[in-house]
UniProtKB/Swiss-Prot annotation:
Bridged cysteine pairs (disulfide): C28-C131, C38-C105
UniProt keywords, alphabetically: Cell membrane, Disulfide bond, Glycoprotein, GPI-anchor, Immunoglobulin domain, Lipoprotein, Membrane, Pyrrolidone carboxylic acid, Signal
UniProt name for this protein: Thy-1 membrane glycoprotein
This protein's encoding gene: Thy1
GO molecular function: GPI anchor binding; GTPase activator activity; integrin binding
Lineage: Eukaryota, Metazoa, Chordata, Craniata, Vertebrata
GO biological process: angiogenesis; cell-cell adhesion; cell-cell signaling; cytoskeleton organization; focal adhesion assembly; heterotypic cell-cell adhesion; integrin-mediated signaling pathway; negative regulation of axonogenesis
Length: 162
């Protein structure tokens, strides 16, 4: 086997085993705000996952939020971040055509051999869809699991019939 292929295969296995692989990056509009959902694996036992949201516009990188790079001052007042175990949600307030470009979500596990994973999405205001109610609910699925378990319990106790 080619040594380069062996190294690439080993690195991809290590990246997945380290548990910080970005699985998807989606964008949508909530009122006039851009919402970026960066879903990722999380098999780490501590908070060693570092992240960065950035925008590349006109061949220039602008860091919006994160622990890897220094966020630009012009975005700090417009950005909010929700950080949960399997999803990081960045909201950019008052999204305009000046904010269009390629958005990136990068995750990195710190340590002796830092590994990183990223996804990108091209965002244009006239192509954005409105965020659906169901995707807002998916951010925190624990209440849905509780609801399903409660329905089963109520059905078992004959309080409701489905």
């Amino acid at each position: 086997m080619n040594p380069a292929i062996s190294v690439a295969l080993l690195l991809s296995v290590l990246q997945v085993s380290r548990g910080q692989k970005v699985t998807s990056l989606t964008a949508c509009l909530v009122n006039q705000n851009l919402r970026l959902d960066c879903r990722h694996e999380n098999n780490t036992k501590d908070n060693s996952i570092q992240h960065e949201f950035s925008l590349t516009r006109e061949k220039r990188k602008h860091v919006l939020s994160g622990t890897l790079g220094i966020p630009e001052h012009t975005y700090r007042s417009r950005v909010t971040l929700s950080n949960q175990p399997y999803i990081k949600v960045l909201t950019l307030a008052n999204f305009t055509t000046k904010d269009e470009g390629d958005y990136f979500c990068e995750l990195q596990v710190s340590g002796a051999n830092p590994m990183s994973s990223n996804k990108s999405i091209s965002v244009y205001r006239d192509k954005l869809v409105k965020c659906g109610g169901i995707s807002l609910l998916v951010q925190n699925t624990s209440w849905m699991l509780l609801l399903l378990l409660s329905l089963s319990l109520l059905q078992a106790l004959d309080f409701i019939s489905l």
